[in-house]
């Protein structure tokens, strides 16, 4: 979400020094980090070449954690302590969670009346903010390892439909992860940046973004470097996870299988996800689940999957219709449709979108990566690295903001789809004679009754001079910044008394809570570094063991008996060292095995060369 960037105040860059800035797509299912290198945005892989980081964190006793692929592997065996799709819980209350009994977690409210969701683990109660911070920190470390330097800051993407509470939770997670947040940017907007800069397209475009947990639709007008978001919509509780759940439910009805334990529920959901993914390329796939009650194998046709999830695709298209109506556009006025999010790989989704708009969607860029790439381009600009200042991005606010008036009604101050950053003011007056205070209740939503909208904050303006009802003039000003976050001020015009509040959602984290988490992070920084080194050492050891054992299986016959015995002894020593809590011990054993197999590697190379040259004449090689 950025206006024309010349340079940020206080950030005039040294023209000879490039700041490292990254874009982060904090996704429900997977997360990515990208950066601009040599003028091109690219996603940064981990040390094994993997770009996608599963958005999964496993909590273990004594403060230990597994993040990403290692945690994902434990989803079916330690479901209660392995938290996935935490993005769906960001800024939410327990009442907001749909069917919590179907999830393998033990939920608890952290603080009565504030509603912060906690998930109980063997390492204590964790919030979605803490889980997201672990993922963000992992991506930050990946970027710093790639560049061998600290990063200046990051642009983090959020769904366009995220409300103030969810955006604030994302900012809290970034702070907890030690990331200098340059800006929050809407995911569809990031996709528009990537496509607009890569393809130079102009006209009206729809960005259809179906991720793991959220759906967004944005209608954009692109013209000569200006990106104007003319309307947004979506569903913050619709994504690939829901397709998994619908398929799992349908198969359960067909087979009569009802998973009971948390582990069985997780295995069942994972089996449904794998089956869904297989149906992207196949007409029939087998859902296979190893449950505590026995193994389940059930063939699913793509047509069955499409039928059992058609209502979800229809929900997304209903949001598309609303967004087009808000923009005052007919579907045939849309020149192109951009698909974003891994869930758009489903054939039924692509077919439904193509049929709705009467044209095939654009799939030039990897739908998993396009959001991170756009965020990286924006981060590069905000860091002052980009010499091109010809991109103007006009974003909009997704939900109306207003205040409660007498009778529990909502008076809108800023309407949805208004371009941001923005500020709007409206005058109010007192209700009673001699009234010296005014309560301001800030709400968000499209309904006319306060009870049907989301409460954001409450504050009071005191010190109003006593006067007749209706005589006082109180100006209430709403200001929404470039991140879509709100501050509210109220000022009595005659006396000048005023009050301000930066809206902190009633179920967000307080600054004290964030500070406490940061302090905990500082206190365990050394321990975390040691834990990271230990994990890396064990990974390297496992990799060396697998490579050596594979080589022995293939070419072990080239070794003499005493050579084989020496290598076997080194393997046993390394395998024994993996159980150590000392990274140096494991590293020493790994290096010893590497050194001890050098002559074996040379023998294997000689054999390969001899086999390659067997039967060849000198003339045939010249």
From Swiss-Prot:
Disulfide bonds: none
Pfam family, one: HSP70
Membrane-crossing residue ranges in chain numbering: none
GO biological process terms on file: iron-sulfur cluster assembly
Highest taxon of source: Bacteria
Annotated keywords: ATP-binding, Chaperone, Nucleotide-binding
Thylakoid among keywords: no
GO molecular function: ATP binding; ATP hydrolysis activity; ATP-dependent protein folding chaperone; unfolded protein binding
Key word Secreted present: no
Reported function: Chaperone involved in the maturation of iron-sulfur cluster-containing proteins. Has a low intrinsic ATPase activity which is markedly stimulated by HscB.
Family: Belongs to the heat shock protein 70 family.
PANTHER family, per database record: HEAT SHOCK PROTEIN 70KDA
Protein name, entry field: Chaperone protein HscA homolog
Source organism of this protein record: Delftia acidovorans (strain DSM 14801 / SPH-1)
């Amino acid at each position: 979400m950025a206006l024309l960037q010349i340079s940020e105040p206080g950030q005039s860059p040294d023209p000879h020094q490039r700041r490292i800035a990254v874009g982060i797509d904090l996704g429900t299912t997977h997360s990515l980090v990208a950066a601009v290198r040599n003028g091109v945005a690219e996603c940064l892989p981990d040390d094994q070449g993997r770009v996608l980081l599963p958005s999964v964190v496993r909590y273990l006793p004594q403060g230990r954690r597994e993040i990403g692929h290692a945690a994902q592997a434990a989803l079916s065996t330690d479901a209660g302590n392995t938290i996935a799709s935490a993005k769906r819980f960001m800024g939410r209350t327990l009442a907001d969670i749909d069917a919590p009994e179907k999830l393998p977690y033990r939920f608890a409210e952290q603080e009565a009346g504030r509603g912060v969701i906690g998930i109980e683990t063997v390492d204590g109660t964790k919030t979605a903010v803490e889980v997201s911070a672990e993922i963000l920190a992992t991506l930050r470390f990946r970027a710093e390892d790639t560049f061998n330097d600290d990063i200046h800051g990051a642009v983090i993407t959020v769904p366009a439909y995220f409300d103030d509470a969810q955006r604030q939770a994302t900012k809290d997670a970034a702070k907890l992860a030690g990331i200098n947040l340059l800006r929050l940017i809407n995911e569809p907007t990031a996709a528009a940046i990537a496509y607009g800069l890569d393809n130079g397209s102009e006209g009206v475009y729809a960005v259809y973004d179906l991720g793991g947990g959220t759906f967004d639709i944005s209608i954009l007008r692109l013209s000569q470097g200006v990106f104007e978001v003319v309307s947004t919509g979506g569903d913050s509780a619709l994504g690939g996870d829901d397709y998994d759940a619908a398929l799992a439910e349908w198969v359960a009805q067909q087979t009569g299988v009802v998973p009971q334990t948390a582990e069985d529920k997780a295995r069942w959901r994972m089996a449904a996800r794998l089956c869904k993914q297989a149906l992207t390329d196949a007409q029939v796939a087998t859902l296979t689940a190893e449950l505590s009650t026995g193994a389940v194998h059930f063939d699913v046709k793509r047509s069955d999957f499409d039928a059992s999830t058609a209502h979800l695709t229809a929900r997304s298209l209903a949001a598309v219709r609303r967004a087009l109506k808000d923009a005052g556009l007919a579907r045939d006025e849309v020149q192109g449709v951009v698909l974003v999010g891994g869930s758009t790989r489903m054939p039924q989704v692509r077919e439904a979108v193509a049929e709705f708009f009467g044209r095939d969607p654009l799939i030039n860029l990897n739908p998993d990566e396009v959001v991170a790439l756009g965020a990286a381009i924006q981060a590069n600009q905000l860091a002052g690295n980009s010499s091109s200042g010809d991109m103007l991005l006009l974003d909009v606010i997704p939900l109306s903001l207003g205040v409660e008036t007498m009778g529990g009604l909502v008076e809108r101050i800023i309407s949805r789809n208004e371009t941001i950053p923005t500020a709007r003011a409206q005058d109010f007056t007192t209700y009673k004679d001699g009234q010296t205070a005014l309560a301001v209740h800030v709400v968000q939503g499209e309904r006319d009754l306060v009870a049907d909208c989301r409460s954001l904050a409450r504050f009071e303006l005191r010190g109003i001079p006593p006067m007749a009802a209706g005589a006082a003039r109180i100006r209430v000003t709403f200001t929404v910044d470039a991140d879509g976050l709100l501050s509210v001020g109220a000022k009595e015009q005659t006396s000048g008394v005023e009050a301000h509040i930066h809206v902190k959602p009633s179920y967000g984290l307080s600054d004290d809570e964030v500070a406490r988490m940061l302090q905990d992070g500082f206190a365990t920084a050394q321990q975390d570094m040691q834990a990271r080194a230990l994990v890396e050492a064990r990974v390297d050891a496992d990799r060396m063991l697998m490579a050596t054992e594979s080589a022995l299986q293939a070419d072990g016959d080239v070794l003499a008996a005493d050579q084989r015995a020496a290598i076997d002894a080194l393997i046993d020593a390394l395998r024994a060292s993996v159980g150590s809590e000392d990274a140096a011990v494991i590293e020493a054993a790994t290096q010893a095995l590497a050194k001890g197999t050098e002559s074996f590697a040379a023998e294997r190379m000689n054999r390969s060369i001899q086999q390659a040259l067997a039967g060849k004449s000198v003339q045939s090689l010249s």
